[in-house]
Amino acid sequence: MAMKAVCVLKGDGPVQGVIHFEQKASGEPVVVSGQITGLTEGEHGFHVHQYGDNTQGCTTAGPHFNPHSKKHGGPADEERHVGDLGNVAAGKDGVANVSIEDRVISLSGEHSIIGRTMVVHEKQDDLGKGGNEESTKTGNAGSRLACGVIGIAQ
């Protein structure tokens, strides 16, 4: 049975968006789609963070969702956090149209992202290849521009 989730991204600045998640069945890939506006042109890190706690903005969402204690990586890497979805690209108009298919995240079970926080970052994620310690944790993606808790949708 298909499962769906949604996330409304908001931050302190102009960045906002709505992201949809759909998984046809357990074990199938999750299709991530939506739009984020108010970004600067270029690539922005896009990750699922550990907690669904936005009580103090995006900072209380904790680190990337990483149940297997792996190093940060890109979406196609074997060594990656479950929440590592790479980058979204914004055009000159500041709009990023999101279209990602990921086989590691899930909407149920051990890798479920339901109740966790989706975050879009200030800078490009270097996918763990930046050559420093921060790269292996966050991809040097910088501050958290907007976030929202991922919830079950109909």
UniProtKB/Swiss-Prot annotation:
A lipid is attached at C7 (S-palmitoyl cysteine). The modification N-acetylalanine is found at A2. Palmitoylation helps nuclear targeting and decreases catalytic activity. Succinylation, adjacent to copper catalytic site, probably inhibits activity. Desuccinylation by SIRT5 enhances activity. Induction: Expression is induced by hypoxia. Keywords: Acetylation, Antioxidant, Copper, Cytoplasm, Disulfide bond, Lipoprotein, Metal-binding, Nucleus, Oxidoreductase, Palmitate, Phosphoprotein, Zinc. Cu cation binds at H47, H49, H64, H121. The modification N6-acetyllysine is found at K123, K137. The modification N6-succinyllysine is found at K4, K10, K92, K123, K137. Destroys radicals which are normally produced within the cells and which are toxic to biological systems. Belongs to the Cu-Zn superoxide dismutase family. Homodimer; non-disulfide-linked. Heterodimer with SOD1. The heterodimer CCS:SOD1 interacts with SLC31A1; this heterotrimer is Cu(1+)-mediated and its maintenance is regulated through SOD1 activation. This is Superoxide dismutase [Cu-Zn]. It comes from Rattus norvegicus.
